[in-house]
Amino acid sequence: MLFSGKYQLESQENFEAFRKAIGLPDELIQKGKDIKSISEIEENGDDFKVTITTGSKVIVNTFTVGKEAELETLTGEKAKGVVHRDGNKLKVSLKGIESVTELVDGNTIANTMTLGNIGYKRISKRV
């Protein structure tokens, strides 16, 4: 299955605690918790472009599976990491955050991020 497509956030778990743990200010946490972000994924072999739009904030990351890339984190910082593919999962570690994005079925993406013992999960559906 291909990741390519546009997905809208449907649900999320542990949003506030995770955002606090990564250092986002309360004002941004409150502002962002009710916004349904849109993720657009373009996949061409091992090359990916991921655009995440949350309100007026847009994060664009491009990477090639297995090669080091500079990626923008949720806090807006840039960090180098290597994205690995494991079947229908993309995995990366950035600044201590472990991220796994799984194509659950043809229409659903689950993204789980973990920092220490604090986890965050978001489910997005294809639109």
Curated annotation (Swiss-Prot):
InterPro entries: Calycin (IPR012674), Fatty_acid-bd (IPR000463), ILBP (IPR031259). Keywords: Cytoplasm, Lipid-binding, Transport. One of its GO terms (cellular component) is cytoplasm. Signal peptide: none annotated. One of its GO terms (molecular function) is lipid binding. Its main location: cytoplasm. It is found in: Cytoplasm. PANTHER family: FATTY ACID BINDING PROTEIN. Belongs to the calycin superfamily. Fatty-acid binding protein (FABP) family. This is Fatty acid-binding protein, liver-type. It comes from Epinephelus coioides (Orange-spotted grouper). The lineage of its organism: Eukaryota, Metazoa, Chordata, Craniata, Vertebrata.
